[in-house]
Amino acid sequence: MSKRVLLTGATGFVGRQVFRQLAAHDVRLTVAVREGKQSSLEENPSVDTVIRSPDLFAKTAEWWSNALHGIDTVIHCAWYAEPGLYLQSPKNLDCLQGTLNMAKGASRAGVRRFAGVGTCFEYDLSHGMLSVETPLKPLPPYAGAKAAT
């Protein structure tokens, strides 16, 4: 039996690249995308299921538990990222709470791995080149919410 992966944000800046890599390795994918987002995901043979929602971050842990039934791994790339607005937006708190609900639902559904994708903004950028040892120093709300998840 092959492993099943749920990818959020599959049409976004980072998620699109993650999707390409997973599809190239014949991973069975369920993708969760924002309703109304035009894409050709359904036509990709690696995609088993497309979950569309007007707001993935408004879903409850119970909803996620049901949606994640049979999923082995969640790769969470979705986040509010409107250019020029996202770093200071209070919508980051909605993303934080929604991500926690998703993680709780994943745990209840028996998901074995949950990977939340971050960015460089969580780190102390005064250290120059970033590495896994670079200390966290999230300054804008976006970075704080990402670091909290």
Predicted regions and their residues:
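N-terminal Rossmann NAD(P)H-binding glycine-rich loop of SDR-like oxidoreductase domains
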Residues: K3-H25
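Structural motif
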Residues: R4, D72-T73, R113
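N-terminal Rossmann-fold cofactor-binding loop
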Residues: A32-K37
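Short, conserved SAM-binding/catalytic segment
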Residues: Q38-D48
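Conserved catalytic-core motifs of eukaryotic protein kinase domains, centered on the activation segment
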Residues: E42, P83-K91, L125-M129
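NAD(P)H-binding glycine-rich loop region in Rossmannoid oxidoreductase-like domains
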Residues: R52-Q97, G105
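Conserved Rossmann-fold NAD(P)-dependent oxidoreductase catalytic core, especially the SDR/UDP-sugar
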Residues: H76, L100-P141
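Active-site Tyr-X1-5-Lys
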Residues: L139-T149
